[in-house]
A protein has these predicted regions:
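Glycine/proline-enriched, intrinsically flexible loops and inter-domain linkers
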Residues: 1-347
Length: 347
């Protein structure tokens, strides 16, 4: 309690608790880990064993330069990120489609193999949760959300599930791993180890397919959170190291390197990709958070719709914008900082 707490501080007690199979491989490649909801996650990668630890500071610390290099490599070549900490579940049953349509503000995917980004609002019209929803087959959907909010998101699902048995929930968080391949050379890399056609025509944005990566089965989703060409590879977790090794081997000729959570955060902010708990929350209306294209008021009834319409009629007081901060040398705005104009807080 009586000590200095630094930005992005990671505490060591009780760790490691939950680990993905590829963690040992990531550590050998220089990973410096943090944790979310008990899961170890690679925050950044050090270039040598001597630098493979955090040095906490309110100013830029040793990871800043290396995270920048990770971002550059993803933007110019390709990067591999472990996101097995994602919260994952399957919703199925004769009432699954109707239930999910009421749970989220966006239209859920209607065709098998399609993927939509959907937001669950609370009853006041604020943003409670964000789900990636993939339709696997009739009455069967695969849901992915932030690992830090697994309990919150899955409790919300249970809160609104009908009690008549028409909807079945299956928690897949511990049984499914996720590796994210992203960057302009990601198609070249993945094409070397799968027979699936990865062209835009055959595998468009926001679609998913069952593929084989080497000898391992995976659900490949054409999407990612860093704004580059890429795929999320969701797989039975026992196949993870096989998939990881195949990708790293195939990527040698394309400058494939692992990247961590901090590089992902930097890249997603550049694209104004939002997160629940930072840019989105229950304190702000979905429209204030810039979710206009993800909220379909004309689709029919859904949780929070009427409250959101009422909020809209009264008028919004806030608007989410991306703020660029220039001429910074050794200390950065890390989020949740007040913004002043003429000594007045404006955001």
């Amino acid at each position: 309690v009586f000590t200095v707490h630094y930005p992005d501080e990671e505490r060591e007690e009780g760790r490691p608790l939950r680990q993905a199979p590829c963690d040992d491989r990531l550590k050998e490649l220089g990973a410096v880990f943090g944790q979310k909801f008990g899961w170890e996650r690679a925050n950044w990668f050090a270039p040598s064993k001597e630098l493979q630890k955090d040095d906490w500071s309110f100013r830029r610390s040793r990871w800043f330069e290396h995270v920048g290099n990770e971002c550059k490599n993803v933007a110019e070549n390709a990067g591999l990120l472990d996101m097995s900490a994602f919260a994952k579940c399957r919703i199925s049953g004769p009432g699954a489609e109707e239930f999910l349509d009421n749970l989220v503000a966006n239209k859920i995917p209607k065709k098998n193999g399609r993927v939509n980004l959907c937001h669950a609002l609370n009853t006041a019209g604020g943003v409670h949760s964000e789900f990636t929803i993939a339709k696997e087959k009739d009455n069967t959907f695969y849901l992915v959300s932030a690992g830090a909010f697994q309990r919150l998101d899955h409790d919300w699902i249970h809160k609104w599930m009908p009690k008549d048995g028409s909807v079945i929930y299956e928690n897949l968080t511990n049984s499914m791993g996720v590796l994210v391949l992203a960057g302009p050379k990601s198609r070249d890399i993945l094409s070397k180890i799968t027979r699936t056609d990865l062209s835009n025509e055959s595998f468009p944005w926001l679609s998913s397919k069952k593929i084989n990566v080497g000898l391992a089965p995976a659900i490949a989703m054409r999407m990612n959170f860093v704004g580059e060409l890429g795929w999320e590879l969701h797989h039975p977790i026992e196949y993870q190291n096989h998939i990881f090794d195949k990708l790293m081997e195939a990527g040698k000729d394309f400058s494939l390197k692992p990247f961590g959570i901090r590089a992902m955060e930097s890249l997603r902010v550049e694209k104004t990709y939002k997160l629940v708990g930072t840019e989105m929350s229950i304190e702000y209306a979905a429209f204030e958070s810039g979710l206009d294209r993800f909220v379909h008021l004309n689709k029919g009834k859904f949780i929070g719709r009427d409250a959101l319409v009422e909020w809209q009629q009264k008028g919004f007081k806030n608007k989410m914008v991306t703020l660029e901060v220039h001429d910074v040398e050794d200390a950065d705005a890390l989020g949740n900082n007040p913004i002043y104009i003429d000594n007045q807080v404006i955001g």
